[in-house]
Amino acid sequence: MTMNIAKMIDHTLLKPEATEQQIVQLCTEAKQYGFASVCVNPTWVKTAARELSGTDVRVCTVIGFPLGATTPETKAFETTNAIENGAREVDMVINIGALKSGQDELVERDIRAVVEAAAGRALVKVIVETALLTDEEKVRACQLAVKAGADYVKTSTGFSGGGATVEDVALMRKTVGDRAGVKASGGVRDWKTAEAMINAGATRIGTSSGVAIVTGGTGRADY
């Protein structure tokens, strides 16, 4: 079971003060425990790709992070650049203000810009930032992500005060059905919480506590 859950973990280090040494350590841990990916900021993608060369651990990065308030064109460029540097998964933040303004067409275009830039070269996960949304907005965001061709919907950046909840994961799974994966992220620090998220429908876990989860401990960081 430990190895099964390891394959669902995006081993994450997104804090702005992360050093190269810490990124290398993250990659070493990912190789040791067999995590699905490492998730790092775009500036560290080349480093992670170098460290993980020849392994099946994928490099994941973030787009429009953490606010989601850049333009579709900017997010598309970030995506192309990240893939050129070695990323094989991208976690993008939706335009939250546009969603709340009822500008669904813009939200969909924003997601589609990243999906088209990834063009089958990288998985696209769409962060809806559940802590800032009503349930109706969460459903609408997930529907737009699926419509735009995203591979996953994801709960949180970990930078907006609230992380994944079992209720949100279940709602997102109900909304997307089998059309997309669901990634629970933010505040998942131990085995019990990770298991609860998976039971609610999560198929990927984003956490900086991956080692603690698979070794039975409890991590301290939010993300």
Curated annotation (Swiss-Prot):
InterPro entries: Aldolase_TIM, DeoC, DeoC/FbaB/LacD_aldolase, DeoC_typeI
Source taxon at top rank: Bacteria
The keyword Cytoplasm is annotated on this UniProt entry: yes
Molecular functions per Gene Ontology: deoxyribose-phosphate aldolase activity
Pathway of action: Carbohydrate degradation; 2-deoxy-D-ribose 1-phosphate degradation; D-glyceraldehyde 3-phosphate and acetaldehyde from 2-deoxy-alpha-D-ribose 1-phosphate: step 2/2
Active site (record annotation): 91 (proton donor/acceptor), 154 (schiff-base intermediate with acetaldehyde), 183 (proton donor/acceptor)
Signal sequence, renumbered to the chain: none
GO CC annotations on file: cytoplasm
One GO BP: 2-deoxyribose 1-phosphate catabolic process
Reactions it catalyzes: 2-deoxy-D-ribose 5-phosphate = D-glyceraldehyde 3-phosphate + acetaldehyde
Keywords attached to this entry: Cytoplasm, Lyase, Schiff base
Keyword presence, Heme: no
Subcellular location(s) of the protein: Cytoplasm
EC number(s) given by UniProt: 4.1.2.4
Role, per record: Catalyzes a reversible aldol reaction between acetaldehyde and D-glyceraldehyde 3-phosphate to generate 2-deoxy-D-ribose 5-phosphate.
HAMAP family: DeoC_type1
Family label: Belongs to the DeoC/FbaB aldolase family. DeoC type 1 subfamily.
Protein name: Deoxyribose-phosphate aldolase
Source species of the chain: Geobacillus kaustophilus (strain HTA426)
Gene this chain is encoded by: deoC
